[in-house]
Amino acid sequence: MADPRLNELLKWSIEQSEATKNDPDAPPAKTQLTPELMAALMGGPSDADLMKASMEIITSDNAEEVSLDDKLVAFDNFEQLIENLDNANNIANLSLWTPLLDQLKHEEREMRKMAAWCVGTAVQNNEKTQERLLAVGGVPMLVDLATKEDEPVDVRRKAVYALSSAVRNYQPAMDLFADELTKKGHKTDKVDATSMEAVDEVVNGLREKIGKA
C-alpha cells in the first residue's frame, strides 16, 4: 500500500508546479506542507514516527525477532529523541506514556533502568511532561522502584534521577513524592519544590540510603 504521505507530497508538488507555471503571483497550494510531508520530502521518517517505531520494538513480545539488545538499542534511540523538548511533549500525543511506564515493571533490570532514565529525560525542566507523569501515576511507581531493597542499585539510582527531575519546581509531584516516601518508611515533611536545596536534601538522602544497601 502506498504511503499516504507520499500521495500528499505528490499533490503538493503538482499544485506548486501548476500554480507557478500559470501565475507566478498565485496563492499558495491548497495542500499544506506539514512536518510529515517535509519528512517524506527529505526522504526520512519524522521524529514522531521514530518514537512510535522505537516503542513498538521496546514493547514487542516476539522474542524470536526482537532480542533484548534490540530493545535496549530502541530505548537508547527513544531517549535521544526525547531530549528534544517538543518530542518529550509529544509522548502524550502519541499515547506513549503508558507503555513507557509499563517498562518500569519489566522482568529485565536493564529495561527497568532504561525506562527510568527515559522518564527522567522527558520530565527534566518541563512542567508539561511533569504534569503528564503525575496524571498517569508515574511518581508512585518510581518511588516503589527507588525504595525496593531487592532492586539492583543501578536501577534504583535511575529511579531517583527520574524523581529528582519530576519534582523540581512542580509542587504537586513534590507533595506526592514526600507522601509516597513516608508510606515506604522514609518520613518526609512537606518540601518547597522551588527550593533546590530542600529538594536536594530529600533526593540525596534517598541516594545515600541506596548507597548503603
Swiss-Prot record:
Q: Name one GO cellular component term.
A: endoplasmic reticulum
* Recorded GO MF terms: adenyl-nucleotide exchange factor activity
UniProt-recorded name of the protein: Hsp70 nucleotide exchange factor FES1
Entry's PANTHER family?
A: HSP70-BINDING PROTEIN 1, PROTEIN FOLDING REGULATOR
Q: List the disulfide bonds.
A: none
Q: Which species is listed as the source?
A: Gibberella zeae (strain ATCC MYA-4620 / CBS 123657 / FGSC 9075 / NRRL 31084 / PH-1)
Name the protein family: Belongs to the FES1 family.
- Enumerate the Gene3D superfamilies for this protein: Leucine-rich Repeat Variant
Protein purpose: Functions as a nucleotide exchange factor (NEF) for Hsp70 chaperones which accelerates the release of ADP. Required for fully efficient Hsp70-mediated folding of proteins.
